[in-house]
Amino acid sequence: CLRMVAMHYGKNYSLQSLRSRSFITRSGVSMLGISNAAEDIGFRTLGYRLSWEQLRDEVPLPCIAHWNQRHFVVIYGIKKQRRIPCIFNRTPPEGLKSNRSRNYLIYVADPASGLLKYTEKEFLRCWYSNQKEGIKEGAVLLLEPTQEFFLL
């Protein structure tokens, strides 16, 4: 994941170099390990638990997300889907569901599966990991390149 984010900003690090910096083990790597490696190559990092609305509206992309509570992916795009015109005047007839609340596409780079596109519902099912005061949250690592990143 970190390699993908570094490439986004124009730097190419070997996988081996980043693995050694992140202290990867047989059981994988932690968000702290990724954060330490990122700071080692010149990123400023912040780990957060966020609601979907915070991720969608406030987070600069790309960022790294904890995925299915077992590995990490890069979120590189969140786009509102074009709305299909509704043929009903106000609300759909009883029995038909409106999908107006789920109208985003989330673009994810998964080191295991490649470039993927998820509907909001699919994405949230994989990303949510916690509920705080009735609000569902997921974990992300925000990365911002510093001047040091570009000088290394």
Give names to the regions the model predicted:
Residues S22-V29, D57-N68, F72-R82, N89, ...:
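Noncatalytic regulatory segments and standalone regulatory/sensor domains
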Residues Y48-L50, P111:
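Conserved beta-strand termini and adjacent loop/short-helix elements that scaffold enzyme active sites
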Residues S51-W52, P62:
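Intrinsically disordered, low-complexity segments enriched in polar/charged residues with Gly/Pro
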Residues P85, L96:
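Alpha-helical and His/Cys-centered functional microenvironments
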Residues C1-G47, Q54, Q69:
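Cysteine-nucleophile protease catalytic domains, especially the papain-like/related folds used
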